[in-house]
Amino acid sequence: MDIIQAIVLGIIQGLTEFLPISSSAHLRIFPALLGWDDPGAAFTAIIQIGTLAAVLIYFYQDILRITSATISGLVNRNPFGSQDSRMGWMISAGTIPIVVLGLLFKKNIETTFRSLYIISGSLILLALVLMYAEYLVKKREARGEKMLSLDKVDWKEAIIIGLAQSLALIPGSSRSGTTITGGLFLGMTRETAARFSFLLSLPAVFAAGVYQLLKVWPELMASGDELVNLTVATVVSGVIGYASIAFLLDYLKKHSTYLFIIYRILLGVFLLAMLSMGKLEAF
């Protein structure tokens, strides 16, 4: 990998991490289309630290408030005494499924699941599920139903959305896509589902990124160029990711997710066509 590839991959990660179109899929697809080597699951996990930083900066007030309230609740032996402390526990509960399943299927995530056939299928399948979730949202809006707000998220919702997040272990599913879809099924507005999705991403993305970084650290120390490339890609992904968060939250205030649904289906079909014609290899 050279510096130009690192910058391009950083831009792709930043653009696609928060949009429901799967960053891991795009980091697998674009190198294949451009004739580059697959950057691998470790590279994908590490540069997500950049987009993690974007979430920390964008939501720093919410994060400080939630963290402070959660710690205060523990110290005062009243862990659910405030809405912010409850949110801290809901985020923790929602993180459990992806941690457990990530450890159980670690080998598959790094190998089998990176097949372009699996990625194309995931892109299309999640698009169809998200389309149905949008249909349910339209029906609720037509009936004038009250939507689920963040302060009403309880254990059930946190675990269900956490299970949805664990589907993102399969490239092509999209972490934001699965969690936003889960939120829509539970009756959240699009913007509320996206906000909870971003907050829920913090523990899992941090853990995966640090784990992979420690795992490859000796190799990075032995290769200065690789360390520079990884650092550049991570920084670029953070800068672009911040803008991507702002865009999506504003976009979902006024629009549905149909734009992303159409894109996912078209990309999935394109991939299948390229694979069937022998223009791309599955691995």
UniProtKB/Swiss-Prot annotation:
Gene behind the chain: uppP
Signal peptide: none
NCBIfam families: PRK00281.2-1, undec_PP_bacA
GO biological process terms on file: cell wall organization; peptidoglycan biosynthetic process; regulation of cell shape; response to antibiotic
Keywords: Antibiotic resistance, Cell inner membrane, Cell membrane, Cell shape, Cell wall biogenesis/degradation, Hydrolase, Membrane, Peptidoglycan synthesis, Transmembrane, Transmembrane helix
GO CC, one annotated term: plasma membrane
Catalysed reaction equations from the record: di-trans,octa-cis-undecaprenyl diphosphate + H2O = di-trans,octa-cis-undecaprenyl phosphate + phosphate + H(+)
Bilayer topology annotation: Multi-pass membrane protein
Protein name: Undecaprenyl-diphosphatase
Remaining remarks: Bacitracin is thought to be involved in the inhibition of peptidoglycan synthesis by sequestering undecaprenyl diphosphate, thereby reducing the pool of lipid carrier available.
Role description: Catalyzes the dephosphorylation of undecaprenyl diphosphate (UPP). Confers resistance to bacitracin.
